[in-house]
UniProtKB/Swiss-Prot annotation:
It comes from Geobacillus thermodenitrificans (strain NG80-2). One of its GO terms (biological process) is translation. Coiled coil: none annotated. Part of the 30S ribosomal subunit. Forms a bridge to the 50S subunit in the 70S ribosome, contacting the 23S rRNA. GO terms for molecular function: rRNA binding; structural constituent of ribosome. The gene is rpsO. PANTHER family: RIBOSOMAL PROTEIN S15, BACTERIAL AND ORGANELLAR, SMALL RIBOSOMAL SUBUNIT PROTEIN US15M. This is Small ribosomal subunit protein uS15.
Amino acid sequence: MALTQERKREIIEQFKVHENDTGSPEVQIAILTEQINNLNEHLRVHKKDHHSRRGLLKMVGKRRNLLAYLRNKDVARYRELIEKLGLRR
């Protein structure tokens, strides 16, 4: 299921770095994580949906690149974000 505008707004409110922030790496990564989790649930039910699986892999790659960027730019923000999102167990 696609992300609703309301849910997206909640994520932006939770992870924004400053007022009117929609494009910071933290917000982008949080939105991608939510989309990835939703798509994972879809793929558990629809195992043969290879088209969506490819989209999932693209999202994971994009999130990975954004995480690498944030880690190189500011390690403290990176660590705080992965703690909040529960990534890298």
